[in-house]
Amino acid sequence: MITCHFINWDKCLSHQIWPAITKGWPDTDKPVHFFWGLAGNNVKKIKEVSDKGEEWWFVDTGYFSMPIKRYPEPMILDKNKTYFRIVKGKLHTIRGKVGTGQRLNELENKGIDVNFKGWYTGDTKHILLCPSSPTVTYHINGISQEDWIKEVTSTLKQFTKREIRVRNKPRPDNQWWGTDIKDELKDCHCLVTNMSMAAIDAVMNMVPVICHTDNVVSPVASHDLKFIEKPLRPGRKTMNEWLKYVAENQFTLEEISNGTAYRVLQEQNI
């Protein structure tokens, strides 16, 4: 039995996504839950279904996609170029099979940047610290976002003398609103995060990453802050395989509705 947990706000994108899920996902006697983000009571509900041992899937914005408009209310600007990730039992995709490259090529043909450009080889300067939202940080790390920033900064200073800059997720009421992370990735030595998808921006703009092991970038990143001066920089073959793998884990509304998402995810034995 499929249960789609709606957010109690009629503008929430879940109201567009859940009809696609119920149409494209086979319904069985086994309980299967779908959650959109961690808003509302989703954190509590996810814990409840996990404690029962029931299957649950996390749905949120895609990894390589045309951005949605977020403010003043969320809006899909181009359904053909907007992708959503569907992840079993976690917030990010961290396991699965490397695809053939067909889905990756489709993204490229749509004008979505999926081209690995290598790594900076010249002098680098600062470290960019990009925390996840307060909700995700507490869910993953069990501490506030502020405490996470303090702890990580303190630990980094044991291993580097580089400038440490903090960049939060842009919101209308903060200093990063209207800014582009690419500007802060220039001359950046390494981006450090827990679960932020800023990690994707980094590796796609020649900057290595240190992140939580549950971050989608985890397979091509370092995980221990002691490696800050020499973070992992995988070769092109590894990065291209990672890109193919990630492309197998995000889907358009049409692909969710017509069963493509279910089929592709089942082929990966997730």
Where are the model-predicted features located?
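Residues that mark the start of a beta-strand
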Residues: 1-3, 32, 125-128, 207
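Short, solvent-exposed loop/turn segments at secondary-structure junctions
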Residues: 9-12, 38-41, 62-65, 132-136, ...
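A basic- and aromatic-enriched beta-loop-alpha substructure that forms the phosphate/nucleotide-
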Residues: 45-105, 196, 202-204
